[in-house]
Amino acid sequence: MGLKAAQKTLFPLRSIDDVVRLFAAELGREEPDLVLLSLVLGFVEHFLAVNRVIPTNVPELTFQPSPAPDPPGGLTYFPVADLSIIAALYARFTAQIRGAVDLSLYPREGGVSSRELVKKVSDVIWNSLSRSYFKDRAHIQSLFSFITGTKLDSSGVAFAVVGACQALGLRDVHLALSEDHAWVVFGPNGEQTAEVTWHGKGNEDRRGQTVNAGVAERSWLYLKGSYMRCDRKMEVAFMVCAINPSIDLHTDSLELLQLQQKLLWLLYDLGHLERYPMALGNLADLEELEPTPGRPDPLTLYHKGIASAKTYYRDEHIYPYMYLAGYHCRNRNVREALQAWADTATVIQDYNYCREDEEIYKEFFEVANDVIPNLLKEAASLLEAGEERPGEQTQGVQSQGSALQDPECFAHLLRFYDGICKWEEGSPTPVLHVGWATFLVQSLGRFEGQVRQKVRIVSREAEAAEAEELWGEEAREGRRRGPRRESKPEEPPPPKKPALDKGPGGGQGAMSGPPRKPPGTVPGTARGPEGGSTAPAPAPAASPPPEGPVLTFQSEKMKGMKELLVATKINSSAIKLQLTAQSQVQMKKQKVSTPSDYTLSFLKRQRKGL
């Protein structure tokens, strides 16, 4: 059983538009042919990014010239996907799979696949791969690479298993995706899960097992169960997102970028990206490089990705916020970038850092110890230059420099680190070390003391204790004195922003869009019904609270450092000590506690006692 007659009529594919036309036709079917589409994309990518030299020893292979926009009068060449080439590759793949899997040995009760059958298909793909190759190399994600080079990367293996299952008529087997891993779901309503590929250094022994253990340990790799369960159209979107346009470290294929952008817009228009936050971020990045007339701007697409994560995945995806922060960083929007990174840390704080989460650790490490310090360093230089030569800078440059005079930016920086510290609490692997502390001190030092002191850090525990004490005093002394000052309900609190709910329907700082929030307020770090309270603590009548953002820390480390963080002069030694000390001894707690109970009492000892 090969290609259908309707599919054959679309060949040969001589241009980007021809490939888009093929995808549109397949997406119009109930079951788009994953094998066909992956072979076509792999073929085009190979001759546009891997082997750009026009071969003379393959008579069936030709290249279609077309005018190039740059330089004027130049030509660009597109590899012609002839029917004979694609049909031969298609027949080879389907014959290999059907010849190796005897479906009669695996009864399908109720028309659903068994774990043994899924494991068998994954064995066929796995055992067909080369024994030794660099598994992180580029351009080995498609079935074209599998057939012609017997090489696949990690997610490519998972996709190949799904494509093979479709070729066998197993319609219940679908791709499952987290932000750094892939496996399959199958059975009634996709309730069963099975590992089919490796992750990181390789976990061959996990193939066939469920992902329940990873979900239970609250690792980012499995997103606490909030992973994507793809249908066939989303699996097409996955292969489009997997297109790698890089020719080398410094050059991308313009044709592949255009092809990916057009295919993503096709999927967007058909509604197949609604549940795919990372695809929306990918499309936004492409639009930033080359805007499409009449289409939504990149910022709108980034926010759509965040909205998708909130609506369908309990706001437990990291990369939608990373995409947004990267956009603002590239455009030197310091305040917005810091806010998006803080929102990213607010999401990660509810995970446990596990051994296989090294990819997201590297992301946060780079942001905290490279990107943010350099962004603030540049802002400091612009601020200094503006003070020396006032009136010579553009409004955007002035805005970038003035970020260091904005207490709201400082509050976002603290919220970012608060999320990282909370992420570490209860985790089996420490996160923070002295390298983090060094750059934290450096970033704190970019803000003047009077700016830092405008941020008001409150503690719900302190508020509760003070309220309890006040009620006790009222009971004892109510008959002996007049009403307390705190009992005046008509006395309005200082302006503040209400707490942001991170649930599926809740708002988020990064989702507020163009309207600016009231000055002097930032969202708290907590998520869900009980988190993020930004209400100020009752202040003594003699010292009214300072104007500025109000922030509630969630992590015990940041709570222990709150006086140091807003002090007039930064005590770098004390900050470094307190940020790293618990990381060194967190597995030797003095009492049995839940993951959220994270005592820092030993940090109050004298230095010689440590």
UniProtKB/Swiss-Prot annotation:
CDD domains: Menin. One of its GO terms (molecular function) is Y-form DNA binding. GO terms for cellular component: chromatin; histone methyltransferase complex. Residues 537-548 have a biased composition (Pro residues). It is found in: Nucleus. Residues 462-552 are annotated as: Disordered. It comes from the Eukaryota. The modification Phosphoserine is found at S487, S543. Keywords: Chromatin regulator, DNA-binding, Nucleus, Phosphoprotein, Repressor, Transcription, Transcription regulation. GO terms for biological process: chromatin organization; negative regulation of cell cycle; negative regulation of cell population proliferation; regulation of transcription by RNA polymerase II. Its main location: nucleus. The modification Phosphothreonine is found at T594. Residues 214-390 are annotated as: Interaction with FANCD2. Residues 484-500 have a biased composition (Basic and acidic residues). Essential component of a MLL/SET1 histone methyltransferase (HMT) complex, a complex that specifically methylates 'Lys-4' of histone H3 (H3K4). Functions as a transcriptional regulator. Binds to the TERT promoter and represses telomerase expression. Plays a role in TGFB1-mediated inhibition of cell-proliferation, possibly regulating SMAD3 transcriptional activity. Represses JUND-mediated transcriptional activation on AP1 sites, as well as that mediated by NFKB subunit RELA. Positively regulates HOXC8 and HOXC6 gene expression. PANTHER family: MENIN (PTHR12693:SF3). Component of the MLL-HCF complex, at least composed of KMT2A/MLL1, MEN1, ASH2L, RBBP5, DPY30, WDR5, HCFC1 and HCFC2. Component of the menin-associated histone methyltransferase complex, at least composed of KMT2B/MLL4, MEN1, ASH2L, RBBP5, DPY30 and WDR5. Interacts with POLR2B. Interacts with POLR2A phosphorylated at 'Ser-5', but not with the unphosphorylated, nor 'Ser-2' phosphorylated POLR2A forms. Interacts with FANCD2 and DBF4. Interacts with SMAD3, but not with SMAD2, nor SMAD4. Directly interacts with NFKB1, NFKB2 and RELA. This is Menin.
